[in-house]
Amino acid sequence: MSKLLDPKVLMAIKELSLSAKMTIDGFMSGINKSTIKGAGLEFSQYRSYQPGDDLRSLDWKMFARSDRYYIRESEVETNIAVRILIDASASMNHSDGDFTKIAYARYLGASLAYLANLQGDAIGLYVFKNSGIYSMTPKQDFQHLARLFYQLESINPEGTFTKPIHYKELFAGSQKRELLIFVTDLYQTDEEIINLLDTLNTLRHEILVFHVVSRNELELDFKGYSTFEDLETGETIQIDQAKARTAYKTKLASYLEETRIKMLDRRIFYRTICTDEPLEQALRDFLKQRSKLRI
């Protein structure tokens, strides 16, 4: 299963929808072997059909979507709306080797959308960049999912994060609580992303923040003198890696801890996720947070 969730494997698959399908097929086939039964966890749990299983337990919708036979072992209590928010500011173009943050965000967003669709949830997409917000209202059908994949593939990060708009009106939706999943590198100049989260928090939705970072960003594993460019402002700085690495890591650790506390204070689920990490844990986080939205 883990191989199908490996970013290097996903990057070799050119079609985003196929990548998402392979990822979720691998993830679902391993659910029964895992230990994700945390307290209060409730979701549609599946295992592969075995000869002798009661045919009445076959999930035909699952078969139609994945072309595989699965036995449904427990029921989802309710369907919800899942809104996937993608940061498409220029800093998401940051790369570690050939793999960028936005590429990882695409695969993560597509896999979460595919999994939510299998759960029977309505899925929406919101892409944030300087020129404004592209939005797809949540719907539950496969044509809508195909359009969502297309829009994810079309994302071209540029500029700074979206200027303040009427976020509350955009995300108010129905009276039911929803699940908002924000994939971002949290690069901001004036707390604009935190302000967005504060606004969304007033709607009393469940919010997940996946903070995308790269390994070279965490380790500063460059050699000698290097020139770094701010992808959003164009400003540059030259530093000696050997002299700066220790101080950099100390400041980075402090920043990540401060960010974690900010999210905790707002009761927002927060996880840092590196672009070389498999998607499995993020998918588990989604299922756990989704289980909280019971009507």
Region spans (language model):
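N-terminal low-complexity, intrinsically disordered segments
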Residues: 58-66
